[in-house]
A protein has these predicted regions:
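Short, well-ordered beta-strand elements within core beta-sheets of diverse protein domains
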Residues: 40-46, 61-67, 153, 263-266, ...
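Residue-level signal for inorganic ion chemistry
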Residues: 37, 73, 95, 117, ...
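Conserved C-terminal structural/oligomerization subdomain of aldehyde/semialdehyde dehydrogenase
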Residues: 38-42, 227, 264, 318-319, ...
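Hydrophobic face of amphipathic alpha-helices that form TPR/SEL1-like repeat modules
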Residues: 1-34
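ALDH superfamily catalytic-core signature
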Residues: 237-378, 441, 483
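Generic secondary-structure signature for well-ordered alpha-helical cores
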Residues: 60-63, 67, 82-89, 100, ...
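Rossmann-like NAD(P) dinucleotide-binding subdomain of oxidoreductase/dehydrogenase enzymes
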Residues: 129-273, 398
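Glycine-rich loop-to-alpha-helix module at the N-terminal edge of alpha/beta enzyme cores
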Residues: 38-127
Length: 484
């Protein structure tokens, strides 16, 4: 499918969405294919005025949407889920074109995104309240759950569809309306899903979207008293700023922020399984994943065996345009991402790390970087302290369980962690000791619509997905009834 064929599709939108209408602006910004540098769209560059219009539309639509029965909202959500699945092939190609990940991964993300809509279509019917024992005769105490109101969802470029539905699924299920601010690198994926939402029966004004002038959009959202909740996925630095600004109007906040995930391979681990898990986790989306491993800790007695197998496997990974057959590692999102990877690798090598695979820009040039394995890494290197967000596996040695737990926890972040062992006692000891919101034990994937997703320490606030996800979009109202 050519870029022109994508552009001619009804789901290809380049405006901003207010009250069910896609509007254009004279001022635009370019959306690029990270694999080729080609301009694939010029998108309306919204700012303060457009954002305020979007907020007003969401506020106006809120009373009617919250008044719908849970069953009615559930039916609309389920139809949205069906439409996403029906359009999986086209949506996957759109995502690969604007984001860069291999087509198979992109189609997998479409399914993953749809799973949140399907899940919350069911959870919409379970926003249950409570009857509390009365304190005196002739009285009742009831606790009800009600939608928080207008929600602002600010989503990242690395999972442009899944991060949208993980927020909008529970928001719509709860009875909230929303303003969506997708990342400027990847607005087209979000806009396509919102177009399908309207086809599914989401009323005009319930979902609105703006992209463009990030500071103006953010400032308008944070200043608004109509917006009662912010859900943000992105960097810890930006998240902290949003939390501070939210305090002025006491908005509820959900924050899914940065990580520095450890991956611990104990000497009793299944080494082949650990290598397979490492490849799947670290090099998915070219390492541009918030729960991607940042630090591999391998016990001294199995260190050489693990890193040699890992380096061999990494060398065999095919790099290229995600639309090409057999490609498993696509480009980084933009030149600044390449520069950060280069900076981390060069710093590590200067501090005595050994390049076991890759370690330099890919011959394809542009935003491509060779999948890399670095050995003999240690604390003090930039890649030990900062999230690399690229296809670099940094390997550290350790000797004892107590030592590696201390080193794994020696970070302000706590989003995800992983460890491989066949010792059941160690499973419980280490999982309790690791300071992380999610832990993979002999498992490289920690994200599903069924499980709570979120971090501790400076990696976030709140949980997304699961039965807990709906709670983030509800307020509790207590009714004290007398004279019965």
């Amino acid at each position: 499918m050519t870029t022109q064929a994508l552009q001619d599709h009804i789901l290809f939108q380049t405006g901003y969405l207010v009250n069910g209408i896609w509007k254009t602006l004279d001022t635009t910004f370019d959306v690029l294919n990270p694999a080729t540098g080609e301009v694939i769209a010029r998108v309306a560059k919204a700012g303060k005025a457009e954002t305020e219009d979007a907020i007003a539309a969401a506020a106006k639509a809120f009373p009617a949407w919250r008044a719908k029965t849970a069953k009615e909202r559930s039916a609309i959500l389920y139809r949205w889920y069906e439409l996403i699945i029906e359009n999986k092939s086209w949506l996957g190609r759109l995502m690969t074109t604007e984001q860069g990940k291999p087509l198979k991964e992109a189609e997998g993300e479409v399914e993953y995104a749809a799973s949140f809509i399907q899940w919350f279509a069911e959870e919409a019917k379970r926003a249950n309240g409570e009857i509390i024992p009365p304190i005196k005769p002739g009285s009742r105490i009831l606790a009800t759950r009600e939608p928080v109101g207008v929600v602002a969802a600010i989503t990242p470029w690395n999972f442009p569809m899944a991060m949208l539905t993980r927020k909008l699924g529970p928001a719509l299920a709860a009875g909230c309306t929303g303003v969506i601010k997708p990342a400027n690198n990847t607005p087209l994926s979000a806009f396509a899903l919102l177009t399908l939402a309207k086809q599914a029966g989401v009323p005009d004004g319930v979902l609105n979207a703006v992209a463009g002038n990030t500071h103006e959009i953010s400032d308008a959202i944070m200043a608004s008293r109509e917006v009662r909740k912010i859900s943000f996925t992105g960097s810890t630095a930006v998240g902290k700023t949003l939390v501070r600004n939210a305090a002025d109007t006491m908005k509820k906040v959900s924050m899914e922020l940065g990580g520095n995930a450890p991956y611990i391979v104990f000497e009793d681990a299944d080494i082949d399984a650990a290598v397979k898990g490492a490849i799947a986790n670290k090099f998915r989306n070219a390492g541009q994943v918030c729960v991607s491993v940042n630090r591999f800790y391998i016990q001294e007695t199995v260190y050489d065996k693990f890193v040699n197998k890992l380096a061999d496997a990494v060398t065999a990974l095919k790099v290229g345009n995600g639309l090409e057959e057999g490609v498993v590692v696509g480009p980084l999102i933009e030149p600044s991402a390449v520069n950060k990877v280069r900076e981390h690798v060069e710093d590590a090598v200067a501090r005595s790390a050994t390049v076991l695979a890759g370690g330099k820009p890919h011959p394809l040039g542009g935003n491509f970087w060779m999948p890399t394995v670095l050995g003999d890494c240690h604390e003090g290197m930039k890649l030990a302290e900062e999230e690399t967000f690229g296809p670099v596996a940094a390997c550290f040695r350790f000797t004892s369980e107590d030592e590696v737990i201390q080193r794994a926890n020696n970070t302000p972040y706590g989003l995800a962690a992983y460890f491989y062992t066949q010792n059941l006692s160690r499973v419980f000891r280490v999982s309790q000791a690791i300071e992380s919101g999610m832990i993979g034990i002999n498992e490289c994937a920690v994200s599903t619509e069924l499980g709570p997703f979120g971090g501790v320490k400076e990696s976030g606030l709140g949980r997304e997905g699961s039965v807990l996800g709906l709670e983030e979009y509800l307020e509790v109202k207590t009714l004290h009834i007398g004279g019965l």
